[in-house]
Amino acid sequence: MSPSAANTPSYDDFALALEAQSLDSQKGQLVRGKVCEYSTDGAYIDIGGKAPAFLPKREAALHAVLDLEAHLPKDEELEFLVIRDQNEDGQVTVSLRALALEQAWTRVAELQEGGQTVQVKVTGSNKGGVTADLEGLRAFIPRSHLNEKEDLDSLKGKTLTVAFLEVNRADKKLVLSERQAARTALVREIEVGQLINGKVTGLKPFGVFVDLGGATALLPINQISQKFVADVGAIFKIGDPIQALVVAIDNTKGRISLSTKVLENHPGEILENVAELQASAADRAERARKQLESQ
């Protein structure tokens, strides 16, 4: 065999190279291509393989496409996701819709990671809550996480500001919360050293839960008085209005810690006359703020 013949690719070499090129386009891979032909149920996409890929009409976008030629001009190169391996003719099936959904899950995960709130439009309701659309994904907002819990049908078509409760790409589960979004917004407005007004909503051995009108704060038992407190129920009752100083904020977890002991003029004052301390809380807060700043 001559050197030139040895270096000349054989028919088998071409066949192997062509097969390798076809195998490059497998399910889950991204390919680039242009429309080369339209059909009644889709379009054929030139991706440089053995055969053009097929794009079903239902996979052309997240929404229904009526005019495929207007939606996908022939001279426009786009990126597609392979959703079905090649058939016996070497043709793979591709999708723009599946690619858009994958990109949407990535964006939503990034928004959740950043603690962002988003706006969604309510698309429907059931006994458990409402459904909404976010980036083309179907989301669910439980009834317990809505501001309006009674007439859910009235929410259809409305835009809500929500936070993320769960983003699960594998299970295609996207759960949102309107109440948490409101709480997040309120927490961001509150500052350490601020005197807040609230209402007592819970009494526990470890402290008092205070509703701030959209967010719940905790007044720990060791922050009630400079003196030992044996029973929070001896000082506060459910429904009591309360003023307290914000001493700590955890923006990541949405937690607000309060204190009334910093408002006392002497240890145990709140145990003796809680009404007097609350009535003059604004004047006491200025002194307490200076003490916090000096620490």
Swiss-Prot record:
It comes from the Bacteria. Keywords: Repeat, Ribonucleoprotein, Ribosomal protein, RNA-binding. GO terms for cellular component: ribonucleoprotein complex; ribosome. GO terms for molecular function: mRNA binding; structural constituent of ribosome. CDD domains: S1_RPS1_repeat_ec2_hs2. Disulfide bonds: none annotated. Pfam families: S1. SMART domains: S1. Belongs to the bacterial ribosomal protein bS1 family. Binds mRNA. This is Small ribosomal subunit protein bS1. It comes from Synechococcus elongatus (strain ATCC 33912 / PCC 7942 / FACHB-805) (Anacystis nidulans R2).
